[in-house]
Amino acid sequence: MSEQKQDVAATEQQPVLQIQRIYVKDVSFEAPNLPHIFQQEWKPKLGFDLSTETTQVGDDLYEVVLNISVETTLEDSGDVAFICEVKQAGVFTISGLEDVQMAHCLTSQCPNMLFPYARELVSNLVNRGTFPALNLSPVNFDALFVEYMNRQQAENAEEKSEEEQTKH
């Protein structure tokens, strides 16, 4: 009997990360200079921006939104070829994680699961605009998380240093 209680307690302590739903929250594709842009030499300059948003939507339920914005201009003329914006989202059940683990899960693991969907959507939108194929390179969300944590630690150390200087 006590083994069953221990098994139940151990099960309750296990970290949980489950996908509940993956969906497109928002999408936009603009090609303001069509059709004359196709008469120019195709030397694209790609601008890429990536961010995430997280919202707790219930007990152990989190919505994570991966925002991708791609703006392509032509090098010679500076004309905008296209602007593609995608908000790929998912609802995840997450429990049994400490603060840093939870932050890593929400800002690295969940976006990593969403990225292939967003990359495919961007590729399809660009293709439907009849532009040359655009395949976004994989993103190392773990490295971005480490970079974020290092920035946070540096900012915290800087704040402590400033507080100590004002005390003296």
Swiss-Prot record:
Question: Could you tell me which CDD domains the record lists for this protein?
Answer: Translocase_SecB (cd00557)
Keywords tagged on the record: Chaperone, Cytoplasm, Protein transport, Translocation, Transport
Location of this chain's protein in the cell: Cytoplasm
Q: Give the GO terms filed under biological process for this record.
A: protein folding; protein tetramerization; protein transport
Alphabetically, the GO molecular function entries are:
unfolded protein binding
Gene3D superfamilies listed in its UniProt record: SecB-like (3.10.420.10)
| Record GO cellular component, one term | cytoplasm
Is Protein transport given among the entry's keywords?
Answer: yes
How does this chain assemble? Homotetramer, a dimer of dimers. One homotetramer interacts with 1 SecA dimer.
Family to which the UniProt record says this protein belongs:
Belongs to the SecB family.
Functional summary from the UniProt entry = One of the proteins required for the normal export of preproteins out of the cell cytoplasm. It is a molecular chaperone that binds to a subset of precursor proteins, maintaining them in a translocation-competent state. It also specifically binds to its receptor SecA.
The name on file for this protein is Protein-export protein SecB
Q: Which organism is it from?
A: Haemophilus influenzae (strain PittGG)
Gene designation per UniProt: secB
